[in-house]
């Protein structure tokens, strides 16, 4: 800590920045030391996976690549064919983002129009007007 306190920063003139302070003083910039400039070290990347850095095990393909028998299946769909046809037909347009966005905008706009058309017009206080007669203040004024 004591060695850090002894280091002082001397003002250095930087071309083009000398008049940047309001009082016209030069900016104080610490000169880079030889220690702070380091070249990047070339080192091999080492990643450890499992025991003895084994990345791919030909003897245990199931744990290396995943359980394809559990998730990948060539069996036909267990759902009703009519149900599958319905979802393939009517959900196909919504697989595209643009069509889904248009559907949501039209649905939201129509909902907003319906709610605003069916709203009661006298909800705002300015439309209702005063509900009670005004009470006079402390000096008898309204």
From Swiss-Prot:
The chain crosses the membrane at residues 99-119. Residues 122-142 are annotated as: Disordered. It is found in: Plastid, Chloroplast thylakoid membrane. Pfam families: PSI_PsaH. This is Photosystem I reaction center subunit VI, chloroplastic. It comes from Zea mays (Maize). Gene3D superfamilies: 1.20.5.220. Residues 1-48 form a transit peptide. Keywords: Chloroplast, Membrane, Photosynthesis, Photosystem I, Plastid, Thylakoid, Transit peptide, Transmembrane, Transmembrane helix. PANTHER family: PHOTOSYSTEM I REACTION CENTER SUBUNIT VI-2, CHLOROPLASTIC (PTHR34787:SF1). GO terms for biological process: photosynthesis. Coiled coil: none annotated. Possible role could be the docking of the LHC I antenna complex to the core complex. Residues 131-142 have a biased composition (Pro residues).
